[in-house]
């Protein structure tokens, strides 16, 4: 049984316009490769995220080959991933990043250039009419992707609806969740259209509700949820659909976040293909909000404050006042202010060609640390009950791009004995051929699985 609060699936954070649609692989996202105090570049997180995205590509390839997913271009399209920086310091950083990453087999196809001729070919919209005295540099990986996660998810659910043992309950928020003495879970859901109350009982519950996962996790009452809170962040994009502009840019170009800005604010100018229609997107422009979902309540944040997480949340609030001020400042930006930021990437941008569009909500994890204080996390995390009967996925980026790997982790944690059986091992390797092996360490295996996914998903 799949229970959905809205009257259709994948229309919150998963929907096409509610996220950047980047197939997060660490190719262009500079915040995944932080600079150390001694000037070196740390690449561990980029390697991890790249390997996790390869898991998603393998699963999607299998589903396409089996006819479960439709033509790949309906949900994923080849879109080069590029990083672009300006100024002596950032150019030096990007070159060090390139040297570190390209030496590893996961990133062996990365290119680097400071050549005006190359840049004119790679990103004409960005270099046209740029100050010729400004030092700039870029990296590129051609087999990056733009993903319409909304289309992907709806295609998966459409197939599930054809299966005999699947039921989809729409317009049905969960009002009650509690574990019985026998370890099974009782849930009550109420249909918002008919008022009908349905009682469910199950041996396993997964909470994959984006920003709505934290309140449901708190309702479950599991001990492992104690100390967790959420810091909601809204988002906005500048969007352009004018064909004469859109056709000049065919890539995702990520820059560096401004000094003092949080990792979530890394600016990027993206090609998007949603419902088959190309457009350009620039952002994100973050904002302060108290909602956990785009279609949530202004009381979501205050409603999530419990005695078990009050101290961590107060600790984070106190230690992140700069972040709060930054987010509030973002809210009060004018259209001209936002277009001025865009001109750092696209010097010829005109205000009248771009419209503001709301993105989805992100709920960053607040996690209790030793001593009872709190820490703000910028990734994703699985929280699971000790007995393996309930699990939830919390957090934001890299989000949907690594969802397949996250669900494998859920299976391993919640079904530890079954996953060891030959039947389950065989099935996992059928879905994800690299299962049980490290793509970070095994170059030959990476070469094999990447050749298959690039071909099947038409990304090569």
Residue positions per predicted region:
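Glycine-rich FAD pyrophosphate-binding loop
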Residues: 1-16
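Dinucleotide-binding Rossmann-like beta1-alpha1 core, especially the glycine-rich loop
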Residues: 21-121, 279, 289-291, 297-300
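Central beta-strand plus flanking loop segment that forms part of the substrate or channel wall
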Residues: 25-27, 224-252
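Flavin (FAD/FMN) cofactor-binding and adjacent substrate-gating region
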Residues: 70-79, 84-158, 162-163, 167-169, ...
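C-terminal catalytic lobe of FAD-dependent flavoproteins
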Residues: 134-143, 151, 288, 292-420
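Core beta-strand elements of the Rossmann-like FAD/NAD(P) dinucleotide-binding domain
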Residues: 193-204
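Flavin (primarily FAD) binding-site architecture
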Residues: 207-223
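An anion/pyrophosphate-binding glycine-rich loop and adjacent beta-alpha core
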Residues: 247-318
């Amino acid at each position: 049984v799949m229970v959905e609060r809205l009257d259709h699936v994948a229309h919150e954070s998963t929907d096409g316009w509610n996220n950047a649609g980047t197939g997060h692989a660490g190719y262009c996202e500079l915040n995944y490769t932080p600079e150390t105090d001694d000037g070196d570049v740390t690449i561990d997180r980029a390697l991890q995220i790249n390997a996790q995205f390869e898991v998603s590509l393998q699963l999607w390839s299998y589903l396409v080959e089996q006819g479960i997913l439709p033509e790949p271009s309906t949900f994923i399209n080849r879109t080069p991933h590029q990083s672009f920086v300006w100024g002596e310091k950032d150019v030096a950083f990007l070159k060090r990043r390139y040297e570190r990453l390209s030496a590893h087999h996961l990133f062996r196809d990365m290119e680097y250039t400071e050549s005006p001729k190359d840049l004119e070919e790679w990103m004409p919209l960005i270099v046209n009419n740029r100050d010729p005295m400004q030092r700039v540099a870029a990296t590129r990986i051609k087999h990056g992707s733009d993903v319409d996660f909304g289309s992907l998810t709806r295609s998966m659910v459409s197939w599930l609806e054809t299966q005999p043992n699947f039921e989809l309950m729409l317009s049905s928020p969960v009002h009650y969740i509690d574990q019985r003495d026998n370890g099974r879970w009782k849930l009550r859901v109420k249909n918002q259209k008919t008022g009908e109350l349905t009682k469910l009982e199950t041996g396993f519950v997964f909470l994959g509700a984006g920003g709505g996962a934290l309140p449901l996790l708190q309702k479950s009452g599991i001990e492992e949820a104690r100390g967790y809170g959420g810091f909601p962040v809204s988002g906005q994009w500048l969007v352009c659909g004018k064909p004469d502009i859109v056709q000049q840019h065919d890539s995702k170009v990520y820059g560096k976040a401004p000094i003092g800005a949080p990792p979530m604010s890394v600016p990027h100018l993206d090609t998007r293909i949603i419902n088959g229609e190309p457009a350009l997107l620039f952002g994100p422009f973050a904002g302060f909000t108290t909602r956990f979902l785009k279609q949530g309540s202004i009381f979501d944040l205050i409603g999530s404050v419990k005695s078990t997480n009050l101290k961590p949340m107060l600790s984070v609030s106190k230690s992140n006042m700069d972040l709060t001020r930054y987010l509030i400042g973002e809210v009060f930006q004018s259209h001209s202010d936002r277009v001025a930021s865009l001109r750092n990437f696209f010097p010829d941008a005109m205000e009248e060609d771009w419209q503001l569009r709301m993105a989805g909500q992100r709920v960053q994890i607040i996690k209790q640390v030793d001593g009872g204080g709190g820490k703000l996390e910028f990734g994703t995390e699985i929280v699971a009950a000790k007995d393996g009967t309930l699990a939830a996925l919390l957090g934001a980026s890299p989000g949907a791009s690594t969802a397949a790997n996250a669900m494998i982790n859920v299976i391993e944690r919640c079904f530890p004995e079954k996953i060891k059986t030959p039947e389950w091992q065989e099935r996992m390797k059928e879905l994800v051929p690299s299962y049980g092996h490290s793509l970070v360490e095994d170059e030959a295996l990476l070469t094999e699985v990447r050749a298959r996914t690039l071909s099947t998903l038409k990304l090569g």
